[in-house]
A protein has these predicted regions:
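C-terminal boundary and immediately downstream tail of ABC-type ATPase nucleotide-binding domains
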Residues: 135, 232-262
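A short, surface-exposed alpha-helical micro-motif characterized by mixed small hydrophobic
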Residues: 209-211
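Q-loop/switch helix immediately C-terminal to the Walker
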Residues: 96, 102-116
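ABC ATPase NBD coupling module
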Residues: 63, 76-91, 108, 116, ...
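H-loop/switch region of ABC-family ATPase nucleotide-binding domains
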Residues: 203-204
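ABC ATPase C-loop
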Residues: 160-161
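Conserved ABC ATPase signature
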Residues: 143-147, 151
Length: 262
C-alpha cells in the first residue's frame, strides 16, 4: 500500500525586503493506493495534482516544501528512500514529453528503463512492447524530435510497462491523444493493474476516469473534496461540485452513452 498521510505542500514567497513566507498549495492530503487498483486524481488546472505525484518521488522544485508522511506498506519513507525507489518500485510517467532524452534513440531509452529494473532489454522485446501501443518497431530508431506528441506519450507509457513497477504515478497520460488511442493506453494500464501494479493517474477527464478507474479522488482549492468509487459517483454520490461536473458530461446523456470498461 502506498499512502499519503496529511501531506501539505507549500511554496516560498519573498517580500521586497527578502522576507520569506510560505503559501499552502496542498493542505492535509490523505489517500491510499493499493496494488491492483487505478485511482484517478481529478481536479481543475492549478489544483496541485502533479505536485502530489512529484512529492512522492522527491521531484518537487526547490521553492516548494512538503510536510506530512508518505509510506510504503506502513513504513514511512524519507526523501532519500523515495529517491532510491524511483524507476523500479515507483515509476513516474510525466506530463511533459521533454522527459525523453533528445540525444538518445527510443531503443536506448526503453532499453535503459528495462535494464534498470533487471528486465530483458532485447530489441525484439522492445519492439513487441511498442506494437502493443500501436507503434511500429521501426520507432526504436527514432529520436524524440522525430515523434509526435502522442507518440512520445506512448513511449513514456512503454517505459512504465517495461519496468514492472509496483506503483505507477501517471500524470495526464492521455494528453494529446484521440479517444481511440487514449482508451488503448488506459486499457494497457488496466492490464498492468490486473497484474498487481497500483496506478495513481492524474487527469482532467472525468469521463475517462469513471470508465477506467476504480476510485476517484477529487481536489478542490488544495484539499481533498471527494474520495469515492466510480460506481458510487454513477449512483449520484459525491460532493455537489463533483456531481455537477459529472452530470454536465455528454456521457451522462443516454444519447451519448459509452460502455463501461471492466
Amino acid at each position: 500500500m502506498l499512502s499519503f498521510d496529511h501531506v501539505t505542500i507549500e511554496a516560498a514567497h519573498y517580500s521586497w525586503l527578502g522576507r520569506r513566507s510560505w503559501q499552502p498549495l496542498l493542505t492535509d492530503i490523505s489517500l491510499q493506493l493499493a496494488p491492483g487498483e487505478i485511482v484517478a486524481l481529478v481536479g481543475g488546472s492549478g489544483e496541485g495534482k502533479s505536485l502530489l505525484l512529484q512529492s512522492a518521488l522527491t521531484l518537487l522544485p526547490d521553492n516548494l516544501r512538503m510536510g506530512g508522511t508518505i509510506s510504503l506498506d506502513g513504513t514511512p519513507l524519507c526523501d532519500a528512500s523515495r529517491a532510491r525507489l524511483r524507476g523500479h518500485t515507483l515509476c513516474y510517467v510525466p506530463q511533459g514529453v521533454s522527459a525523453l532524452n533528445p540525444l538518445l534513440t527510443v531503443e536506448r531509452q526503453l532499453g535503459r528503463a528495462a535494464r534498470l529494473c533487471g528486465q530483458n532489454a532485447s530489441r525484439e522485446r522492445l519492439g513487441e512492447q511498442l506494437l502493443r501501443y500501436q507503434l511500429p518497431a521501426a520507432t526504436l530508431d527514432s529520436y524524440p524530435r522525430q515523434l509526435s506528441g502522442g507518440m512520445a506519450k506512448r513511449i513514456l507509457a512503454c517505459t512504465a510497462a517495461l519496468g514492472g513497477a509496483r506503483y505507477i504515478l501517471a500524470d495526464e497520460i492521455t494528453a494529446w491523444l484521440d479517444e481511440e488511442l487514449a482508451c488503448l493506453l488506459l486499457g494497457q494500464l488496466r492490464e498492468l493493474a490486473n497484474r498487481g501494479s497500483g496506478i495513481l493517474w492524474v487527469t482532467h477527464d472525468l469521463a475517462l476516469a469513471v470508465r477506467f478507474a476504480d476510485r476517484i479522488v477529487a481536489l478542490h482549492q488544495g484539499k481533498v473534496s471527494d474520495t469515492l468509487s466510480c460506481h458510487h459517483l454513477r449512483q449520484g454520490q459525491g460532493s455537489e461540485m463533483l456531481r455537477a461536473h459529472w452530470q454536465a458530461l455528454p456521457e451522462f446523456n443516454s444519447l451519448f452513452s459509452v460502455p463501461e470498461v471492466s
